């Protein structure tokens, strides 16, 4: 039996027969990487942010044609986007996969808000219909009171975002939206969905999670304080979602696949509410995609506190799937968040905890991971380090290149060389693997007895365990290649390299450390952060850490957990200012606040 038989088993979703149980989740635009995922086995590809006008999407069904007599007109920008989406769709379909996106409706706008009545671009507003020309104010500028509602979340205001993420309030009070605005949103979403189907999309998904979209704001008691037929009771709060899906099913047909994205248990609704909602949706939904709320360790930054629960979403999805089955509800359940291990994916499907698994980051780390799974080579899949920098993936930097450039990176060579790689950190290890795969004879030198370089210390704080997994993977890959020789505990001197008569050498020894001009820093009781990791057990009881970025904060946490009384000193006003706010709140602030021997001090003196 194939070790990943459940991942590779087909499944019927509406009128589609998916070849595997893995999908490519939302997060990428219509770029080259999406067809590459289809090439490597993804059954459904999400294409995000389809912002073209409904009339332009519908133009494919217009007998006059796009830009033809009686047809819709396109700007150069719209034409470029139109062609890019169409090309992406054609490639996905030609490779045997299906395409899915999210229909977009007319979002109600507050008075004074950008696009709203009296606001920039809105009716009667600057640059809007019947309004004056735009002045020098930024879009949406003006007193907060003009907009009404709960404005605590602002992605451009770090303090507001920190507060919102801390309190779990990522939406707005929707009491100001008129009945007309609600129906306009529903009807325009359905119209857009019909045109997306005509355009060539095989499946549609409606996002009803996270409190930052109108559907979840109506569903949540945190945002919905209305007293009319759209608020109050659970039935009234669900009215928008239920009405929308009923109209979508009628417009798209009984077999067209529809997905709803929900949080099983979140701010403003309980787990039992989610079960009830899915039951009410009935046959109007084919797939229930479960995501976590904002207060978790996966979204939008990915380190998890424990290796035992690599996906914080799995436990509640498992419970939901089995509870739905017990009630006789046979909607397919899709789970996402943190699935970067083929064995975990297989077990999740084999145990019946989910029917589908949506993946985003893993496609960046190893675009060929499903191909390796099909070949039974799960141990060769490149592990994702969950750094949340998918566009510049550190474990797969070649992904940013176009196909032609990527193809040239690993090519068989016409002349095999004897190559030395100096440095056993991640850069040197990866270089040795690439050289070996191209056919060269490689010798890797590392002056320490252990491979990994500076990443050997990166997982000292236990929530960064993915770093250790990546180093272990690199070492396994090196040892599997017969044309790689490891020289650990060996300093690669010029004399040694000359004596061995190497054709070429790659130097991967990392940067030099920069020391701050701080009085006392050269005394015996001072040391660099890497030295502090290595001699942590011999450091005195009281330790001061100079520098409060991620490195300084993590060594402080590490030493405090070892019993030292640590004070981290920073001149930046807060710890880890360079990290995404959710990562700071969940993995840094919550973490160090639970350690009584950890503290920090901010100061303004610069040296």
Label each residue range with its predicted role:
Residues 334, 443, 485-489, 527, ...:
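General small-molecule cofactor/ligand-binding pocket signal
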Residues 346-358, 363, 475, 492-498, ...:
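C-terminal structured "cap/appendage" subdomains that terminate the fold
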Residues 413-444, 487-501, 509-518, 522, ...:
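Rossmann-like dinucleotide/flavin-binding elements
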Residues 303-309, 409-411, 416, 457-469, ...:
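Short, contiguous acidic/charged loop-to-helix segments that flank catalytic cores in large enzymes
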Residues 30, 340-342, 364, 491-494, ...:
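Short acidic loop-to-helix transition motifs that present clustered carboxylates
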Residues 444-479, 558-606:
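Rossmann-like dinucleotide-binding cores of NAD(P)H-dependent redox enzymes
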Residues 1-422, 426, 430-442, 450, ...:
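Flavin-dependent oxidoreductase catalytic cores
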Residues 506:
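N-terminal Rossmann-like NAD(P) cofactor-binding module of classical short-chain dehydrogenase/reductase
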């Amino acid at each position: 039996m194939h070790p990943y038989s459940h991942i590779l088993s087909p499944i019927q979703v509406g009128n589609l027969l998916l070849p595997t149980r893995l999908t490519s989740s939302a997060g990428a635009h219509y770029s080259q990487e999406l067809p590459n995922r289809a090439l490597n086995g993804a059954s459904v590809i999400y294409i995000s942010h389809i912002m073209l006008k409904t009339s332009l999407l519908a133009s494919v069904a217009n007998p006059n044609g796009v830009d033809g007599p009686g047809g819709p007109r396109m700007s150069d920008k719209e034409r470029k986007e139109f062609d890019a989406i169409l090309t992406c769709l054609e490639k996905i379909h030609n490779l045997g996969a299906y395409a899915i996106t999210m229909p977009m409706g007319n979002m109600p706008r507050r008075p004074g808000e950008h696009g709203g009545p009296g606001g920039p671009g809105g009716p009667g507003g600057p640059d809007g219909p019947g309004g004056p020309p735009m002045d020098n104010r930024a879009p949406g500028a003006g007193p907060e009171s003009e907009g009404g509602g709960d404005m605590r979340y602002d992605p451009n205001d770090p303090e507001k975002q920190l507060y919102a993420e801390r309190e779990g309030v990522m939406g707005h009070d929707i009491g100001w939206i008129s009945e007309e605005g609600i129906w306009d949103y529903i009807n325009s979403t359905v119209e857009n969905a019909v045109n997306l189907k005509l355009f060539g999309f095989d499946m549609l998904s409606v996002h009803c999670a996270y409190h930052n979209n109108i559907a979840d704001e109506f569903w949540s008691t945190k945002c919905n304080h209305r007293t009319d037929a759209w608020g109050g009771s659970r039935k009234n709060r669900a009215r928008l979602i239920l009405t929308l899906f009923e109209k979508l099913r009628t417009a798209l047909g009984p077999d067209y696949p529809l997905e709803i994205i929900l949080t099983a248990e979140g701010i403003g609704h309980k787990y039992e509410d989610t079960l009830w909602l899915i039951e009410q949706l009935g046959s109007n939904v084919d797939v229930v995609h479960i995501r976590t709320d904002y207060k978790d360790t996966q979204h939008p930054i990915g380190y998890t506190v424990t290796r035992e629960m690599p996906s914080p979403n799995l436990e509640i999805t498992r419970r939901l799937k089995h509870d739905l089955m017990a009630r006789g509800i046979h909607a397919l359940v899709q789970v996402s968040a943190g699935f970067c291990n083929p064995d975990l994916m297989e077990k999740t499907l084999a145990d019946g905890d989910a029917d589908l698994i949506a993946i985003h980051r893993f496609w960046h780390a190893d675009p060929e991971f499903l191909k390796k799974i099909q070949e039974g080579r799960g141990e060769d899949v490149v592990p994702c380090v969950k750094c949340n920098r998918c566009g510049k993936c550190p474990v797969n930097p070649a992904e940013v290149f176009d196909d032609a450039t990527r193809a040239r990176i690993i090519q068989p060579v016409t002349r095999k060389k004897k190559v030395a790689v100096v440095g056993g950190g991640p850069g040197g290890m990866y270089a040795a693997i690439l050289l070996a795969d191209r056919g060269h004879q490689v010798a890797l030198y590392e002056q320490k007895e252990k491979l990994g370089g500076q990443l050997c210390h990166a997982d000292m704080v236990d929530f960064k365990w993915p770093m250790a997994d990546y180093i272990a993977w690199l070492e396994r890959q090196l040892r599997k290649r017969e044309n790689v020789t490891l020289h650990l505990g060996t300093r690669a001197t010029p004399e040694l390299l000359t004596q061995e008569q190497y054709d070429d050498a790659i130097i991967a020894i990392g940067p030099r450390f920069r020391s701050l001009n701080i009085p006392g820093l050269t005394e015996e009781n001072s040391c660099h952060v890497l030295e502090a990791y290595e001699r942590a057990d011999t450091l005195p009881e009281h330790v001061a850490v100079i520098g409060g970025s991620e490195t300084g904060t993590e060594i402080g946490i590490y030493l405090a957990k070892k019993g030292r009384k640590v004070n981290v000193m920073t001149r930046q006003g807060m710890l880890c200012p360079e990290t995404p706010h959710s990562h700071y709140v969940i993995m840094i602030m919550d973490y160090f606040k639970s350690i009584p021997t950890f503290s920090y001090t901010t100061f303004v003196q610069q040296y």
